[in-house]
């Protein structure tokens, strides 16, 4: 036993050396375990951000559809309006970069001021765009269509993990597929419209709703 060995004896020194090696091995094993945990947390965080953004997109779509239903006269031609064509005022056509630079200034607050249907649509879009920006990384959106044919909504957000090789230290951001009009299924739901001019790293999620 180390406790009973003579101080300075060969046996005592040997036992102390074995104990030191055991401690070093234990530290090495612990370090490897901690690195594994850190890697797992990083991967979990990556998928959590993407899942969170998609979940936010669904909530934002519900928010916009409710606003349009409350103010339908500003959403363009209705089913009953045969022979009459009006353009929806719930439209967003600016590309991704332009929206990032927009100040989203509200000039008329329709929560405290009586607004026309047109003013309400403008207010709704500004509030909604603020929520898009706050809910998703560098969030932006495109909105087209009308209440007769349905409103097409494209949500856009920046995802730093959208790269060509996730396992490479020199991975580069890639550009999402641009919609051609012939896509189906998941490809149709995740392509970015050409009008968005989405840069590398931006993901898109497309939806359609009829008020």
Can you describe what each PLM-predicted range is?
Residues 1, 46, 117:
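Generic anion/oxyanion-binding catalytic loop in active/binding sites
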Residues 1-13:
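Single conserved hydrophobic/aromatic residue that forms the stacking wall/gate
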Residues 24, 52, 56, 62-211:
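Flexible, low-complexity segments enriched in proline/glycine/serine and punctuated by aromatic residues
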Residues 14, 18-62:
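Aliphatic-rich helix starts adjacent to a transmembrane/signal segment
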